[in-house]
């Protein structure tokens, strides 16, 4: 980045990060990569999050990076859930030559990226949709409105649909309540439900 070779920077990031524009915006870099940066011992760590965000945005606006994909190996993998874990898993497997299908219970893929994180932190159409398209460009298929345990089961995916393995990335959808009086009253929402309602109803 310092040398101005943003394409090379994007290629380096793409080797290990499937969702760089998202990670650069919402990951807690201060406790993860930046928290481990040796420069932070005596000064400020490298602003890894901001650099990743910049490079990812530049890459998206300039044609993107085409990761190297191994030849098809003939194995099908099912991924349950299209949140960040499911998308990252599907992306990595597709690069290794697997035929990957994501099964998403809701009507749009993305999980917490789509329904949980507010628009001002993570633009849905500009960033999330573009990152999902980059995963699909690797050959990953996404089926929405498919509820694991009802529409399909793990057994049916393995025994009837011909999948060699199933990755379950269903997310942390159920909140943990505090057990205080009145928490079950009408109009009292968990953080998850509040954020989902906000995103679905476009309250912003």
Give residue spans per PLM region.
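Rossmann-like dinucleotide/flavin-binding elements
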Residues: 79-103, 143-159, 170-177, 193-204
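Glycine-rich dinucleotide-binding loop and its adjacent helix/turn
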Residues: 55-71, 96, 133-147, 175-204
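N-terminal Rossmann-like dinucleotide/flavin-binding domain of flavoprotein oxidoreductases
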Residues: 10-20, 51, 112-163
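Short cysteine clusters
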Residues: 23, 27, 33, 37
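Residue-level detector of alpha-helix initiation sites
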Residues: 18, 83-85, 108
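N-terminal Rossmann-like NAD(P) cofactor-binding module of classical short-chain dehydrogenase/reductase
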Residues: 167
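Ferredoxin-type iron-sulfur electron-transfer modules in oxidoreductases and energy-metabolism complexes
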Residues: 1-25, 42-71
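Glycine-rich FAD pyrophosphate-binding loop
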Residues: 98-114
